[in-house]
Every structure is written in C-alpha cells, then in structure tokens.
Amino acid sequence: MRGAILATAAALAGTAMADVAHMRRHGHDSFHQRRSPLAEADATCGCTTEVVTVWGPPTLIPVASPTPSTVTSEAVTTLHSTSTTTVTVIASASTPAASPSPATDKVPLPTPAITNFPSTGVYTIPATTVTVFDTTTVCGATTTELPAGTHTYGGVTTVVETATTVVCPYATVEPSGTTVTSVIKTTTYVCPSAGTYTIAPTTTTVPTSTVIVYPTPAVITPGTYTQPEQTVTVTRTDYTYVCPFTGQDEPTSAPAAPSTTAVPATTTAAPETTTAAPDTTTAVPSTSSAAPSSSSTAPASTGAVSGQMGMTYTPYTKGGDCKDKSSVLSEVAALKSKGFTHVRVYSTDCNSLEYIGEAARTSGLQMIIGVFISSTGVSGAQDQVTAISKWAQWDLVSLIVVGNEAIQNGYCDASTLAGFISSAKSAFQAAGYTGKVTTTEPINVWQAHGSTLCGVCDIVGANIHPFFNADVSADQAGKFVAQEIKVLESICPGKDVLNLETGWPHAGNANGKAVPGTSEQAIAIKSIADEVGSKSVFFSYFDDLWKEPGQFGVERYWGCFDTFN
C-alpha cells in the first residue's frame, strides 16, 4: 500500500510538473489536459487488494452530548487622566516684540460718487472735500439715459486719414466678486481705410427707459475738490445718481500738465484722435429764469463788430478727408468778403493751424482756435496743446477754446475739464500767449457747473442752437439766442459771453415748430445776425456730408456760407 501511495504521489507530481511546462508553452491549452496519463495495456501491478466482509447485527454508537461551559464576562473601565503644567514666561526687556508696520493708506481721489436709490423719496448726500497733490489718470464715470431698445454707447472715437493700425486705451468694467471694477485697458484696432471709427463701444438692450452709468478716462490734476451736500428727490425706483466733485478751491499755482496716457499708433502715419467736427444735436433747453440785464459787450480782444462775427471752418472734403492747401487758402480768404472778422477752428488736424493761419494772415482774419476733447478724454487732447504751443502765432489768435461740449458728451466731468483748462492755459502762457482761454458748452451745463468752470474761463463760451428747441420757429431764432445769452451773463458775473456755435439746418426733419429748409435757414440766420451777430460764430461753412444723419436727420446740412451776402 505504501508503494501504491508513493507511486500515485509520484504520478501526480509528474503530471503537475508536466502541466506547468505545458502551460508555459501553450498557455490556455493546459486547462484541458489536467489528468493523469493512462497506464500501458501490458503493464502489471505489483499490488494485491483483498476485501474482507463481516456480517452482524447493526450496533448504535451513542454520541456524547457536549458539556455546557460557563463563560464569565468582566466589565472593564478605562480611566483617562489629564495633567496640566503651567509655565510663566517673562519676556526680557532687551528683546521687545516688533510692532507691525502700519498699512499705507490709499490716497483718495475726487472720482464721481455713484449712488443707487432703490426707492422713491428725498435723500441727502453729505459733502466731501478731497485734496490732490499729484496728477493722476483714473476711471471717471458718466451717465446717459437710454430709452427702451438696443443702444451702443461709450468707446473711443478716432478719425484716421489713411489705412492704419492704432493702439488705443479705453475705459471698461471687469467683474470683481459680486461687483464690477472700472479699469483702463488697451486694444489694437485695424482701421482698413480713412474714416471715423468707434473702438470698444458697449452695446446693451434695455426694456424701459434706463440711466446707464459707464466709465470714462479722466485726469485728476492737483487741487482741492469739493463734493457739496446734495439733496436728491427720487421719483422712480432703482434710480442711479452721479455726484461729481467740483474744484471750487483751485490751487494758487498752476497745476501740472496732465500726463498723456494715449498710446501712439503703431504705424508711422499716426492718426489724429480728435479730428471729428462736433455734432450739433445737443438740445438746448429753454429757460424762463429771470436774468438781470447786463451792459457787458463782447470783449475787445475778439474784435467783434456789428453784423456777423465769425464762422466755423473744418478742412474736410465731402468724404471726410483732409483738403489740400490751395482749397483751404481760397475758402478761408472768401470769409473776409462776406464780412466776417473771425474763423473758428476746432482742432489741429489736417494742418489746420498752418494752412488756416496762413489764409487768415493774408486775409486779415482773426482765429478762434480749439483743443478738441473726444471720447479719449483730456489725456488724448494733450498733444494738441503741445502743437498749439509750438505753432505760437499768437498775433492771429483772439481766443482759445479748450473742449467743445466735452461735458455734455460725457467725455469728462467738470472738475477734470477745469483742471485741464488751467494746465493748458499755463502751457500757452509759457509759450508767450497773453489772450483769453475758455471752453464751450450748452447753457444747461453752464447752469449746472458754472461754479467749477467760471474760475478757469476768461469768458463764457456757449453753443446755442435754437433749432433743437421745438417751440422756436425760424423767425424767432434770434430772440431765443439773445435770451439765452442774457441767462449766461448771470452765471459768471463780470465775464462776457460769446455764442461760439449757432445756426439752422437747410434739410432734414422738423422738430416741432423748428422746420429745416433753405428759406427757413435764411430767415433764422438773418434773425440771429440782427439780434446777436456781433457775439456769434455761425455753424458752418459747408455741409458735412461725411457725418451720420443724427437726430432729425439734420447733422449733414448746416452749411450756410452762401446765405451771407
């Protein structure tokens, strides 16, 4: 038996070893061959098996029941003990603890305060005074009321004379947690051809009339700025109010010139960003305010005489390109034959100073020259201040106008404009200019911000367009302008008033009693010239066919040169 067991064990071992080797050679085939090999037919076995059977009655074998055992459990309780040791440390007097460095406070700047009133009522905004020591470029804020619908607003408007690429700074907002933050960013814009382009505007859709607040670049110059206490009566829910600072306490010395933040064009032909002649669609509200009579006359330095004082001139073709020198010389010279004594120029682009200056000198005209502030703000206009200072033909200049409806258009606030006028005046005076400097805005802006502007303006400059008052017909245009001038005389007591832009369109759509047309234009122009011609600059020499039609479709059709005999 032992031999059989050993033989059987040996056979199984051999089969297992063979299976392992087979599995290594053929893998899955070994799973079908796990059995002992058959013995050969003629082999003999050396073992004999005997079976012994015993017969007898069945016997029950009792199974003993297990003896139950008793298990005793013991409760175990674990006790936790905590010991505390108190150590008192006395600091040495020779090693005092270092005091933390005080945090640097941010210098407050007179940016407009924006307040949202969720419900109707009367609210009081407390007064605030801020003193600024350094010139700083910041994101200001402006508002515009949009009627229901889709509108595009803001952005930077630039005029280029040829295809070019410009690198342009613009103001925008970025999300910051649950709010938004106004920032100045820069973009590269390809202008495919000559023309006027608006870069990075914002488009929005409003379901109802809504006041939109959006950022604009602004330069804060040194000085003391006051935000007076304001009482606001809110007549509708969710109303947004912008409370600007005013520079009532101007610095005794001239503030530093604002830093220029505009990035120049990336091509050698850098585009002018301030070449667009102003639109005239600003509605001038009528007023019934009683104004004291004034005996002041036009300033002697302007050379104003009876009849018509001046006319605006922009050196652009019908397509918006720059005119050649010969055209400018002949057209400006013709103003003298019409009885004008002044020509008003808005900007320095298209060689305006050189060409118009030469024509003015030859013809015996005086110039009212301008620094045009566009949507780039005052920083984008600094180059014009430099250009005028270098040109410096002051014997031709009777007045410099810094900005044309810049506040009305939302390009800067009153305090920013006042600071820029002050710094520009200093630059002109340093270059030898001894004449007068002002700005020009509609009457409503002067009424709202006269306290800020009067101190830096030598005269009150206003754009008075009777056509945009729906109750004024062409034959009443002169009386309307005269009434507005009287109101303006009361805003800056002791300072003269000039109507720096006025006229009447000869085509377009009616605005109530104000009807455009060739005959209506002639009637309105004569009415204005008869009433206040010696204090008025007429708009404009030619039609500006390169403009958009604008409100009432009249923006292109203000040319009135041929109306004068």
Swiss-Prot record:
Low complexity bias spans: 251-304
Entry annotated with the keyword Metal-binding: no
Leading EC class: hydrolase
Annotated compartments: Secreted, Cell wall
A Gene Ontology BP annotation from the UniProt entry: cellulose catabolic process
InterPro entries, sorted: Beta-glucan_modifiers (IPR050732), Glycoside_hydrolase_SF (IPR017853)
Entry keyword annotation includes Hydrolase: yes
Any Gene Ontology CC annotation: extracellular region
Sample GO molecular function, one term: glucan endo-1,3-beta-D-glucosidase activity
Pathway annotation from the record: Glycan metabolism; cellulose degradation
Keywords assigned by UniProt, alphabetized: Carbohydrate metabolism, Cell wall, Cellulose degradation, Glycosidase, Hydrolase, Polysaccharide degradation, Secreted, Signal
Active site location: 405, 501
Positions of region (Disordered): 246-304
Signal peptide extent: 1-18
Transmembrane parts of this sequence: none
Reaction it catalyzes: Hydrolysis of terminal, non-reducing beta-D-glucosyl residues with release of beta-D-glucose
EC code(s) of this entry: 3.2.1.21
Family: Belongs to the glycosyl hydrolase 17 family.
Function: Beta-glucosidases are one of a number of cellulolytic enzymes involved in the degradation of cellulosic biomass. Catalyzes the last step releasing glucose from the inhibitory cellobiose.
Descriptive protein name: Probable beta-glucosidase btgE
Organism lineage string: Eukaryota, Fungi, Dikarya, Ascomycota, Pezizomycotina
